[in-house]
Amino acid sequence: MANKKDTKKNLVFKNKKAFHDFTILETLEAGIVLEGSEVKAIREGRVNLKDSFVRIIKGEVFLLNAHISHLSTTHSTYRPDERRSRKLLLHSKQIDKMYSKVTKDGITLVALKLYFNDKNMIKIEVATAQGKKLHDKREDLKAKTMKRETEQVLKSFK
């Protein structure tokens, strides 16, 4: 029974597209405002952060376009929108710091991962990021393949 709890704590949903499309500059951990059925859906793994992004609107931070699908057990009259905007919980100093960075050219806010922390609370990792150009993406792919090949060669000599 203890193993089940441990696996639920370690549920991590990553936004792999963000790591591919952006250069990550700085990360922050934030709380997220959810409804009860959304928490249950996250525990079941019904989350997709692929197209999600973060915006600062009137001094508050929101996660937009994150897909948390509803459960089949929820009543049809009470089904929140799957892609609704969800408020992120941050200190005002953190919001001001992020806002000052975002107003610079080319820097955006991206949701990197959604996970359960040690207290079994759902947290989201938000990053300030700068978009990559096509040649940057190609260089990263080349570096990955070179690293993979060298690891394979080293492994074959062991």
From Swiss-Prot:
Gene Ontology, cellular component aspect: cytosol
InterPro entries: SmpB (IPR023620), SsrA-bd_prot (IPR000037), SsrA-bd_prot_CS (IPR020081)
Compartments, as annotated in UniProt: Cytoplasm
Entry superkingdom: Bacteria
GO annotation, biological process: trans-translation
Annotated keywords: Cytoplasm, RNA-binding
One Pfam family per UniProt: SmpB
SUPFAM superfamilies: Small protein B (SmpB) (SSF74982)
GO molecular function terms listed in the Swiss-Prot or TrEMBL record: RNA binding
UniProt keyword annotation of RNA-binding present: yes
Keyword RNA-binding attached: yes
Role this protein plays: Required for rescue of stalled ribosomes mediated by trans-translation. Binds to transfer-messenger RNA (tmRNA), required for stable association of tmRNA with ribosomes. tmRNA and SmpB together mimic tRNA shape, replacing the anticodon stem-loop with SmpB. tmRNA is encoded by the ssrA gene; the 2 termini fold to resemble tRNA(Ala) and it encodes a 'tag peptide', a short internal open reading frame. During trans-translation Ala-aminoacylated tmRNA acts like a tRNA, entering the A-site of stalled ribosomes, displacing the stalled mRNA.
NCBIfam families on file: PRK05422.1, smpB
Protein family: Belongs to the SmpB family.
The protein's name: SsrA-binding protein
Organism from which the protein derives: Aliarcobacter butzleri (strain RM4018) (Arcobacter butzleri)
